[in-house]
Amino acid sequence: MAILNMQDLELQGKRVLIREDLNVPVKDGVVTSDARLRASLPTIKLALEKGAAVMVMSHLGRPTEGEFNAEFSMQPVVDYLTKALDCPVSLATEYLDGVEVAVGEVVVFENVRFNVGEKKNDEALAKKMAALCDVYVMDAFGTAHRAQASTHGVGLHAPIACAGPLLAGELAALGKALDNPARPMVAIVGGSKVSTKLTVLESLSTKVDQLVVGGGIANTFVAAAGHQVGKSLYEADLIEEAKRLVANAQSRGGDIPVPTDVVVASEFSPTATATLKDVSTVSDTDMIFDIGPDSAEALAEIIKNAGTVVWNGPVGVFEFDQFGEGTKRIAQAIAESNAFSIAGGGDTLAAVDKYGIADKVSYISTGGGAFLEFLEGKELPAVAMLESRGQ
């Protein structure tokens, strides 16, 4: 991939426009989770250290295009950056026709989704953004799967378009995990529905040695193996698909192991009583909410011996502690493993936080949808744009 990297460019005196993913939760005008802001700081600081006049843009939430809405303003982000950066930081509400920004300063643009044409990747809008800078830096992996004016179009028209350190690091880590993985390679794919992760499962089943399924997805595979799943969430219409995926994996010498024991309850609630059962004894009224300790231990052994682990999705309803032991054991196994591990997706990151293993995972992906599309083997529009500009 011939992508220019911001780290390699001379930026002294240059106007640098950085697209970050600063889409953070805000309550009463204050940022409540700053993970994405923290992740963006090294890129912004590097641009300042290189002597640039820095402009930063992002979306926040889902406002109606063409309308200012204070609820989705970037002001709380500006307040945060003012404390985090040792330089002047200001908010530009009107910026498309020009911005005053000096070397050593940071100007944050108001929410890009307030602009009509942002989501449709409007060319006129993209050209206006491109005219503001000498160098455009795409650093938002979380939105790299969307072809929008601030993530794609602007890069086609800017004098120079490059990847920021966060995006470059993300692509390098994903490439290491997927393009040339240390074997055995294990992928853990959780989530509620096979249908939403079908392309991921298909793509990974041709690459990995063991494909571990969890959550509602696993229930469909349990049913495909001929077991009762009671009232559990599963997709009867995808049982044949599940059988095909298992057969494909096994024909390559791999497998998609099905749980041998499960944790069930008769209702979905924080106070539901958890009961451990052999997978062959699930009753008509049971709902499967987690894998049992024997299954968890078997998976932990697979992870322990892995060379590469890709984790996307919990194996149980870990939000309720009585259904969290399976995911906890998986998390511990990843933490203890010598494998190169990469974790991505909102629920996965919540599990990483809950079980305190963030510093034991080799790479934590900032992208949800983009992470999934990369796993599916899809081309990400923003990455394709950077490749074309890097020629």
From Swiss-Prot:
Its EC number is 2.7.2.3. InterPro entries: Phosphoglycerate_kinase (IPR001576), Phosphoglycerate_kinase_CS (IPR015911), Phosphoglycerate_kinase_N (IPR015824), Phosphoglycerate_kinase_sf (IPR036043). The keyword Nucleus does not apply. GO terms for biological process: gluconeogenesis; glycolytic process. ATP binds at K197, E319, G345, G346, D347, T348. It comes from the Bacteria. It catalyses: (2R)-3-phosphoglycerate + ATP = (2R)-3-phospho-glyceroyl phosphate + ADP. Keywords: ATP-binding, Cytoplasm, Glycolysis, Kinase, Nucleotide-binding, Transferase. It is found in: Cytoplasm. GO terms for molecular function: ADP binding; ATP binding; phosphoglycerate kinase activity. Belongs to the phosphoglycerate kinase family. HAMAP family: Phosphoglyc_kinase. PANTHER family: PHOSPHOGLYCERATE KINASE, PHOSPHOGLYCERATE KINASE 1, CHLOROPLASTIC-RELATED. This is Phosphoglycerate kinase. It comes from Shewanella halifaxensis (strain HAW-EB4). The lineage of its organism: Bacteria, Pseudomonadati, Pseudomonadota, Gammaproteobacteria, Alteromonadales. The gene is pgk.
